[in-house]
């Protein structure tokens, strides 16, 4: 029986690897323009760090058999926050960092047992900014990243915004286990669960209406103001969405506000967001982020520095969404250098060197071929390569 990769692991072909590299390099060039410095957090971390003080469930973490409780990172934010609060504690704030790398998560496989999901991510983290100016910079940077990726209007990119303060307003009348159950039902968009709770009719009706309360920021904030009166978070969101409107419109990104939108990771303590596109068969989340001040505080930051926010982009889904990654590079085919029986490998390799000096990819047919027609067939079989036939 042929050996197979572990469930959830991926064997990428050369084209996929090259596309991933181009995507990460494009994003890196944008991050650098905004003053972000690259870091490389470890793949292996202590479970205490990976669980982000309880914000990330241990069942999401791939554990390692070791003397110390170690695991593979399910995301990079916690590791970067730890480094920012220890190794980079003396650096000037705001501290701007970016990283790319593989993350690992576990889930239950359809046939039972555990499945390891392996994904490539690229993202940024901004530390030391307490106000909404951090979110304004990050979302502007996200729009610049979308621009360099070249998403199509037909993919209908949508930026979904939420805020923990909005969810707190919704959950304010409830306490204890009921509050947690309602929060889970709202996040999962589980109307049946809401209807099954032992709540007053008016409370059920309000919760069900809030599940449908998503749309343009102006519309949603007007509806929330009628329910809860004016709140400081409303002004913060208005300012943010007004600032973001022109950049989002330029990239054909629709902004939606949803008071019940929250990630399952209880990592965030302010604004949360996701960028979603229409995939081939279903919507695809390819960017997510938000503010995580509590995590920075757990990592040891003093109260005057315990501020952090960031986002990550999922490279693998982006690769599948984008078909025309780099038309300029695709217009030039790689070169196949083939030589006849009347020539020799040494002469062909001299020709190869001249192509390399021009910056072109050129590969060798290492054995002589009987005719140019045979060489043309080989070039076609290898993906339509341009033929350089060496025949004295």
UniProtKB/Swiss-Prot annotation:
From the UniProt record, report the name of the gene that encodes this protein: hisZ
Q: Which family does it belong to?
A: Belongs to the class-II aminoacyl-tRNA synthetase family. HisZ subfamily.
Protein name (database record): ATP phosphoribosyltransferase regulatory subunit
Question: What is the purpose of this protein?
Answer: Required for the first step of histidine biosynthesis. May allow the feedback regulation of ATP phosphoribosyltransferase activity by histidine.
One Gene Ontology MF term:
histidine-tRNA ligase activity
Any miscellaneous information on file?
Answer: This function is generally fulfilled by the C-terminal part of HisG, which is missing in some bacteria such as this one.
Q: Where in the cell is it found?
A: Cytoplasm
What is one GO biological process annotated to this record? L-histidine biosynthetic process
Q: What is the lineage of its organism?
A: Bacteria, Bacillati, Cyanobacteriota, Cyanophyceae, Synechococcales
Record-linked InterPro entries: aa-tRNA-synth_II/BPL/LPL (IPR045864), HisRS-like_core (IPR041715), HisRS/HisZ (IPR004516), HisZ (IPR004517)
Q: Which GO terms describe its cellular component?
A: cytoplasm
Per the UniProt record, the source organism is Synechococcus sp. (strain CC9605)
């Amino acid at each position: 029986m042929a050996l197979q990769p572990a469930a959830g692991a991926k064997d990428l072909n050369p084209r996929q690897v090259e596309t991933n590299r181009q995507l990460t390099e494009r994003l890196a060039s944008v991050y650098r323009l905004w003053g972000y410095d690259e870091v490389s957090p470890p793949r292996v971390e202590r479970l205490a760090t990976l669980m982000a003080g309880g914000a990330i469930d241990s069942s999401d973490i791939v554990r390692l058999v070791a003397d110390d409780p170690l695991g593979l990172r399910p995301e990079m934010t916690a590791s970067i926050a730890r480094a920012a609060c220890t190794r980079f504690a003396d650096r000037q704030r705001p501290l701007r960092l970016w990283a790319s790398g593989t993350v690992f998560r576990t889930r239950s496989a359809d046939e039972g047992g555990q499945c390891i999901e392996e994904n490539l991510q690229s993202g940024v983290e901004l530390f030391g900014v307490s106000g909404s100016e951090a979110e304004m910079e990050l979302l502007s940077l996200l729009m610049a990243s979308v621009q360099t990726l070249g998403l199509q209007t037909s993919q209908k990119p949508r930026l979904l915004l939420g805020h923990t303060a909005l969810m707190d307003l919704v959950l304010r009348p409830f306490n204890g286990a009921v509050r947690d159950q309602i929060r889970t039902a709202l996040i999962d968009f589980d109307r049946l669960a809401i209807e099954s709770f032992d709540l007053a009719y008016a409370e059920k009706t309000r919760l069900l209406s809030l599940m449908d309360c998503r749309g343009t920021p102006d519309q949603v904030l007007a509806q929330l103001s009628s329910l809860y009166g004016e709140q400081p978070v409303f002004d913060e969101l208005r300012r943010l969405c007004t600032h973001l409107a022109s950049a989002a419109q330029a990239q054909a990104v629709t902004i939606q506000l949803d008071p019940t939108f929250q990630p399952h990771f209880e990592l965030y303590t302010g604004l949360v967001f996701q960028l979603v596109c229409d995939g081939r068969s279903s919507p695809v989340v390819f960017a997510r982020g938000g503010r995580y001040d509590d995590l920075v505080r757990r990592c040891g930051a003093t109260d005057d520095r315990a501020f952090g926010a960031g986002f990550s982009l999922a490279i693998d889904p982006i690769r599948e969404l984008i078909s025309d990654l780099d038309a300029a590079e695709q217009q030039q085919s790689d070169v196949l250098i083939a030589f006849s029986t009347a020539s020799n490998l040494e002469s062909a390799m001299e020709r190869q060197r001249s192509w390399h000096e021009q910056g072109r990819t050129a590969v060798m047919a290492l054995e002589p071929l009987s005719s140019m027609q045979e060489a043309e067939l080989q070039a076609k079989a290898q993906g339509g390569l341009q033929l350089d036939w060496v025949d004295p």
